[in-house]
Structure formats: structure tokens, C-alpha cells
Amino acid sequence: MGLVETQAIVLQTYKLADADKIVLCMTEKSGLVRGVARGARRLKSKFGASLEPFTLIQLTFFEKETRELVTIKGAEIVKSYFHASGSSEAFEGLVYILELVREFAPPHHADEKLFRMLRACIDFLAGAPEHAAAVSAYTELWTLKLTGFLPEFKSCGHCGVPLGETFRGQRFISHEGVLWCQDCRKGGSQPLGAEAYRLLSSTRKRAPAEWSLEFEGASEESMRVVSETARRLVRRALEREPRAGRASAAPDA
């Protein structure tokens, strides 16, 4: 507790009283933080444009153990992604990515991997808006993985037979994201080809740009299965649809 200095990405802001803001940030050292920035809405505020969404900042805040809201003392822009809002694809993708982190990241729980993943995805998407659908799916899978909601995709959910990359039989996947071998598959499961399996299990081994190119080079069926699986797992974890939509890589079945 006390004074904290950390890099942060501004996720969302709210008006407070006549001149203040409440700012929601994903920070490198403290996880998801909600803070009050006094005077942030004044014309000559010391914060300037640093507390706008889609901005990477060096943040200084004061934290008390008994209070959920921190007090923001200073913020300096490291990098702004606001220019990306000029592209509808990039804007929608950024909004969706920020929402995923806002929904899944627990408050005041440091997760440097989640912060680095978020920064890498925003960096790539801001410069390559045409990859919005792929980056959204990548972010879904990584966020699910880091917060414990992504299945391992290593073995049959019933008999336990290994279903990794060396498996030569047919895999099936349920609506809950559980893998089945051919002998154990249940009604409602769909085939999971080798290409789609590699995409689902390779996010942690690939940077956003590399995975996006691999995803977009796959068959339309593989893109559809991966995209739908990631989306279903997000819905299942949240127990509802995300408030912000995301671009689809392929038509829904």
C-alpha cells in the first residue's frame, strides 16, 4: 500500500462531480485499478489527455488498504492509440479487447502476463486494423487461459486418452470446450480438425501478429470453429454475452 508507480493502460473513464474523473486502468504492478483523478476534467488539468481510453501511461497513484478506489496523483503518456479510433475495425476491436480485460481481470491482483498480452494485442491491432477478427479471437483465448477458464486441450474429457499434436485420430469438441475422442464423443459435439486444434492450442506459443497470420491462412471451417469455440467459452465464463461485440472471422453456422 501507499504510493505506487506503474505502467498502465486506460480502459474506461467516468465523469465525477463537476471536474473529476473515475479512471479504470489495467496496471502492470497492481492489476485492475479504479481511481479518482481530481480536476481531470478542467481545461488546464495537469493530466491533459493522459487519462483517455486506449492510452498507455506511466501512472502514479496512492492506495489505502481499506479503500477500493485509489487516488491518482500523476499520469504521463507513454503511447497513445487514439489514432486507431479513426478505423471502425480497429476501434471495435480495441473496445472489445479492453472489455475482455475489464470483465476477467480481478481488481488489485497483479498479472503481468495479462498486462503484456493486452499491450501486445493493442500494439498490433492499432497498426493493422484488418486483423481485428483474428486479434479478438487471440485475446479471448489468451484471457481465458490466464484467468483459468480455457481447457487444456490435451486429452479426452472422458477416457483421458492423449489428444495432443501427435494424435492421428478424429477429435471432437463440445459446446463447453471439452475434447472427446471418437469413442467417447457425445451428442452436440462437432469435429475438430488438426488445423483448428493447432490454432486453439498454440496461442501461448505465438505473438499476436504470428498467430493472426496463421489463423487467417487457415481454412474457413477452421477459422469458424476456433472463433465460435472462443466466443462460447467467453459466454460460458461470463454467463452472458459480452457487452461489446467483435468482428467475425467467418459466418456463424
Protein language model regions, located:
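Non-catalytic alpha-helical scaffolds and adjoining flexible linkers that form interface surfaces
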Residues: 1-253
